[in-house]
């Protein structure tokens, strides 16, 4: 079984288990609360549509849209358009985003157009080949409809997460303001229910993250399909991002990402870091709580696609 077949088989299994687990939770909640599923489903659809409509404006806020004739970034638009055409999809809108970390992402909807966002630090640290490989990955997300699929598969955990947070915050407040035993018990009950929902959400999220990681790998596969051996640059792009992020810290008081003074990085050369990744044996649980596969796993898959098992 080749890489693509393994990916598709794993995605089918992951999606099936995710849908089954979310279905069990949904039916269980409906039974406990004596609420008809005919009420729950329309409510979920409305919430999904709300997210689908507003998410492009939330995710890409502050972004600068690039046009084909842009004097500074017109080349970037043309690069995205070329990759989209080679991927046989409509070219997405292109946005440059002033953020303190290197990143690229696909977002948008079919109303306002699909979009690719690229942050300034990413443009600064990648060469053209690496940027092309990253864009081919993001275009793969659009081609595979990962924005809509990810939003759908994560809908129930998202809603449950909001409910859990609301109940626990309410419980803490009620606990602080409790004037008698009845109010105290009410506060404890709210905290307990909120915690149980949190645990259920966490378990569901494990399945969702598994599916998301597989979709990321499938987007990497699109980079290989479009660029062939040129997709090797995706591995060095990941290495540069990894090295850059080791010089990033989060202010503990404000939660704002700030660039720290340069710190010692074990492997500053991205090519050497890729070589290290290719020799790394990655545990099956290494990225279990991550939205993306562990970088070493991604590099190994890319090289396996290009060179077969001889890596």
From Swiss-Prot:
Cofactor mode of binding and number, as noted: Binds 1 zinc ion per subunit.
Transmembrane segments: 12-32, 35-55, 159-179, 184-204
Annotated Zn(2+) binding sites: 137, 141, 216
Cofactor(s) demanded: Zn(2+)
CDD domains in the record: M48B_HtpX_like
GO MF annotation list: metalloendopeptidase activity; zinc ion binding
EC number: 3.4.24.-
Main localization (coarse): membrane
Active-site residues from the entry: 138
Subcellular compartments: Cell membrane
Protein's recorded name: Protease HtpX homolog 1
UniProt source species: Saccharolobus solfataricus (strain ATCC 35092 / DSM 1617 / JCM 11322 / P2)
